[in-house]
Amino acid sequence: MSCVDCRFAPACVTVRTRNLCENCFIRFLQTKVLRRMERYRLRNAPKDRQRKLILPLSYGVSSLALLHIVSSLLLKQRTTGQKRTAFDLHVLIVDPVSLHPSKGAAASGRLAKIKEAYPDNTYSEVPLRSIFDYDPDIRGDISQHTGIPLGSNPSRSDEEILNLFRASFSTATARADIDGILLRRLIVAFAKSHKCDGILWGDSDSRLAAKTLANVAKGRGSSLVWNVCEGMSPWDIYFNFPLRDLYKSELEVYASYALRDLQQIIDQDPRNFEDLSNRHMSIEDLMSQYVLTQGAKYPGVMANIVRTVDKLTTPGVENAKMCILCRVPAGENLNAASGSQMDIGSNGETTTVPRSTCYGCMRTLLDMKAPTSNSG
């Protein structure tokens, strides 16, 4: 069977009912991505300065595919006689070991291979604890609004503070939620400190659909537009999702063709969810499993989830009250009264939750338990 595009090479993959050869499939996928990056075309570049974009790299198949496509675009601009590239690319890696210590062996040497494959980009690898350096407000937020007495033990390191905070949540959903907040705050703060024009998030349509369902389930529906939609974020930096028109399965096929030399460093997922007990499965895990299994049967339905969010009106951010934890304008969902409130968390303990939190963060903070380490 011949490819329906070039009508010459034999077809090797079926994409959305179309039989394509390897080259035509790669061109199809890359075109989808580049159309989502029209904002950053060379002809739209400012004359007086060079734009800079941040690409957070998780070593997953989606962010690696995005890195390959964007790096290839910039290389083509450099080698075709053009005097400049459309932008400079700064790749940010939050050290996987600082998030999941069990990944230590798998993470070894991966950045060196990435630099060898794409040497023209700028690279930074930072641990999660560097959030204290880039986001000076985070220390006060942890101390003042979660009850962890940081000031009583000044000898405690940033890593100890962060580990204590993350370990204080009693459920897998709360831990995953707070890790997501910390990661976003770190990436945004890092990008702003380096005067970047935007962030290229490597989220596929499948990932965005799972995030949408998970955020609604967690009570974060009011902030959906800033989690899955392109545009200016409340933090004065542009969010771009170049992979939003592509399914995770399509990116996996693309990686098998275009990233043959990097297959060994790609984080393989999904995890075997059947081996996880309910206690260790977060809402994010559950929604990812649902989208991956049902998306194979009904891809159009999964795509409509993200398209529906695109139709939502972006809430105004001027003079909006900001949640002290996730820093999202919460509007009417924010209880701005002074003081704090008492409630019963999922662990059965009475928990003090600051009133200046949005509904989603309030639910997460209710799952906090008392710190188990010595407070000094």
Curated annotation (Swiss-Prot):
Q: Which SUPFAM superfamilies match?
A: Adenine nucleotide alpha hydrolases-like (SSF52402)
What's any GO biological process attached to this entry?
A: tRNA wobble position uridine thiolation
Q: Which UniProt keywords apply?
A: Cytoplasm, tRNA processing
Compartmental location: Cytoplasm
- Say yes or no: keyword tRNA processing present: yes
Q: Which Gene Ontology molecular function entries are recorded, alphabetically?
A: nucleotidyltransferase activity; sulfurtransferase activity; tRNA binding
* A GO cellular component entry from the record: cytosol
Transmembrane as UniProt keyword: no
PANTHER family found in the cross-reference section = CYTOPLASMIC TRNA 2-THIOLATION PROTEIN 2
Q: What is the name attached to this protein's record?
A: Cytoplasmic tRNA 2-thiolation protein 2
